[in-house]
Regions:
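ABC ATPase C-loop
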Residues: 149-150
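Helix-to-loop junction immediately C-terminal to a conserved catalytic motif
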Residues: 50
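Conserved ABC ATPase signature
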Residues: 132-136
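ABC-type ATPase nucleotide-binding domains, specifically the catalytic core motifs of the NBD
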Residues: 14, 70, 95-113, 121-123, ...
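Helical segment within the ABC ATPase nucleotide-binding domain
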Residues: 172-185
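Conserved ABC transporter NBD signature motif
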Residues: 58-66, 78, 111-115, 131, ...
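The feature captures the beta-strand-to-loop junction immediately N-terminal to the Walker
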Residues: 35-37
Length: 234
């Protein structure tokens, strides 16, 4: 079953079209990476899926419903979680307050219970609950952003460059944690990533973008050197 079906979408910044006639499908519970050189529209695609940028043509169907005209908060309530590039935690709020922000809009959510559940995946945060997010290392900030995303148990997580500016040992931990989250919760993961080693470790499937559209796709195990040279080498 597909949780996400994107059909022939266009996305523009003013008069400049960035995404053109792009289509892709993502299976429920899968782990998928979007690859491509800088400037091909990967971040723009994620922003259009979460509703930050409007699409000018095509359709976006999430969990059986057309969400193309929904606002970002409506897509969030429908089950789309998002961790943007740069993490965008609130630096003057504590770790605990940042996590509580993730639960806003969910009146039936028992915050302390869900916080304990989320921290089980990111236990390093437990020692920092009363520290401001802005003083944490990049690795801890990324873990906080991911914990804040999963605290409401989204159906799908959109992650934009989750390894950016993070030490290799923390990158490896995040890779294993994302795989564990997907396996134990059934949350679908769709990420944009430049780190090919990380992408291969986390994702089962890939899409490659070039000039604002998808030009290749398949299983990450089958991503060969020729395809990498053609579409990803600088």
């Amino acid at each position: 079953m597909n949780i996400l079906e994107v059909s022939h979408i266009d996305v523009s910044y003013g008069k400049s079209r960035v995404i053109s006639d792009l289509s892709l499908t993502v299976s429920s519970g899968s782990r998928t990476v979007i690859l491509g050189r800088n400037g091909v529209g990967k971040t723009t695609l994620l922003k259009s899926l979460v509703g930050i940028l409007p699409i000018s043509a095509g359709s976006v169907v999430f969990d059986g419903s057309d969400v193309a005209k929904q606002k970002p908060y409506q897509r969030s309530l429908s089950g789309i979680g998002y961790v943007p590039q740069g993490r965008e935690i609130i630096p003057l709020l504590t770790v605990n307050e940042n996590l509580e922000l993730g639960s806003l809009g969910r009146p039936k959510l028992r915050f302390e219970e869900k916080k304990a559940w989320a921290l089980d995946y990111f236990p390093m945060l437990k020692a920092h609950l009363n520290r401001n997010g802005g003083v944490l290392s990049g690795g801890l900030q990324q873990q906080l952003a991911l914990a804040r995303c999963i605290i409401c148990e989204p159906k799908m997580m959109l992650l934009d460059e989750p390894t950016e500016g993070i030490q290799p040992n923390v990158v490896a931990e995040i890779a294993e944690t994302l795989k564990r989250i997907a396996a134990e919760t059934g949350i679908t993961i769709l990420l944009v990533e430049q780190n090919l080693k990380f992408a291969r470790k986390v994702a089962e499937n890939y899409f490659i973008m070039q000039k604002g559209t998808v030009v290749a796709s398949g299983l990450t195990d089958g991503l060969d050197d020729e395809t990498i040279r053609k579409y990803l080498s600088v």
